[in-house]
Curated annotation (Swiss-Prot):
Motif segment ('KMSKS' region): 235-239
Major localisation: cytoplasm
Record gene name: gltX1
Name the record gives this protein: Glutamate--tRNA ligase 1
Subcellular localization: Cytoplasm
Length: 431
């Protein structure tokens, strides 16, 4: 069972989307199932409506979870299982105040050593714990052995006990920390394979330790994806437009193209242009590069252009809001643009009232009047010949205003290539 577990705290990052796509593809390959879990326990950072945004984005990519879980609905289980760990002496109550902990952290910093919890409260007797009325958190006891796991991308990874430390699993307000809620939920929901970003590598031994402490014996597999870099080779910040899936949609990138590019990054694929359905046939999570990959919007534009060219008539009609007669015109304009709004604007300009260029106003009106009176012409050569004869214009004085009349622009593709696509609509265009 695979899962995607985003938090509703902001716009979806392309790194998160990449993880969702990889999890979904792998679930289709081994038919083990795919679930969505909304990790909404951080009430202060949650943004209303983001759960809906997550579902809508996944839907655009054709990602269909078999089950949707809301993490906060598992709170009673989190509390019950934290209590079990206390009873079983796998965890302990910690009464250390923030001020006390901060002083210890500062001392470690001054000594030039990494801070580790010193076990103060772990040494308290049961009587001392029961008689203490101070607020407390629950800490998982530091492991007594090296914690190891095999990562499908990074290979064998090991963490010494001090690196895992005695970490907090329940806050003083009786809400779970990320690692505890995540570990428990994966266990309860039957997750067996976790594909996520490499920023979670250090969380993995903690989550494994929690499940071990609860007596869970199910095997968990992991694959931690290298981070995505911007074009300058720096880690992509959430403040960068390109990192937002919503922004990419707004710019006119198709879900098909975005998915294609995210699968392509740091991967050796049999072809450059493909769909998620294609990738299911050959994708191998173990072949993902261990090195970070650069996200290049220009490359994504090229891929977007190819997906527009390959799109079915129905898909073009859906994306661009055009009827069937304009489908080939849309694809024709991919030679000039790769983004939906740009192509849409060029097509709409052809069917909009035309504006005469200042330097060709007189010629524009002459050509417009003559063109309206021409008999239908099958080819551009015939159309050009008839129109030149009727207007006595030639060269720039003919072609520039003619282009403006047909496209509302003085620059663009070859009119001889455009004409076959619009000849049947000349009556609508010559306005």
């Amino acid at each position: 069972m695979y899962r995607f577990a985003p938090s509703p705290t902001g716009d979806m990052h392309i790194g998160n989307l990449r993880a969702a796509i990889f999890n979904y593809i792998c679930s289709l390959q081994d038919k083990s199932g795919f679930i969505l879990r909304i990790e909404d326990t951080d009430k202060e950072r949650n943004i209303e409506g983001k759960e809906k945004d997550i579902l809508e984005i996944l839907s655009k990519f054709g990602i269909k979870p078999e089950q949707i879980y809301i993490q906060s609905e598992n709170l009673k289980f989190h509390r019950q299982l934290a209590s079990k760990l206390l009873i079983d002496k796998k965890a302990f109550a910690c009464f250390c105040t923030e001020e006390e902990l901060e002083a210890k952290k500062q001392k470690a910093k001054e000594q030039g050593v990494a801070y580790r919890y010193d076990g103060t409260c772990e040494r308290l007797s049961d009587a001392e714990v029961l008689n203490c009325e101070k607020p407390f958190v629950i800490r998982m006891k530091k492991p007594t052995r090296t914690m190891s796991f095999t990562d499908a991308i990074k290979g064998e990874l090991s963490f010494e006990p001090d690196a895992v430390d005695s970490f907090v699993i329940m806050r003083a307000d009786k809400t779970p920390t990320y690692n505890f809620a995540c570990a428990v939920d994966d266990m309860l929901e039957g997750v067996t394979f976790v594909i996520r970003g490499e920023d979670h590598v250090s969380n993995t031994p903690k989550q494994d330790l929690i499940r071990e402490g609860l007596g869970y014996t199910g095997k968990m597999n992991y694959a931690h994806l290298p981070i995505l870099l911007n074009i300058e080779g720096k880690k992509m910040s959430k403040r960068e437009n390109e990192s937002s899936v919503k922004w990419l949609f707004e710019q006119g990138f198709l879900p098909e193209a975005i998915a294609n590019y995210l699968i392509l990054l740091g991967n050796k694929t049999p072809t450059e242009i493909f769909t998620i359905e294609d990738a299911v046939k050959w994708f191998d999570i173990t072949k993902i590069s261990r090195s970070p990959a650069r996200f290049d919007v220009k490359k994504l534009e090229q891929i977007n252009r190819e997906h527009i060219k390959l799109a079915s008539k129905e898909r073009i009609k859906e994306i661009f809001g055009v009827d069937e007669s304009k489908v080939e015109l849309v694809k024709f304009y991919t030679q000039e643009s790769s983004l939906v709004p740009e192509i849409k604007a060029k097509v709409e300009a052809i069917y909009s009232p035309k504006i005469a260029p200042d330097e060709y106003k007189n010629e524009f009106e002459i050509i417009k009047k003559a063109a309206r009176n021409l008999k239908p012409c099958e080819s551009f050569d015939e159309f050009k010949k008839e129109l030149m004869g009727a207007t006595n214009l030639k060269g720039k004085n003919f072609f520039m205003p003619l282009r403006a009349l047909l496209t509302n622009d003085l620059h663009g593709p070859e009119l001889s290539e455009l004409y076959p696509l619009i000849k049947d609509d000349l009556a609508k265009i010559l306005i």
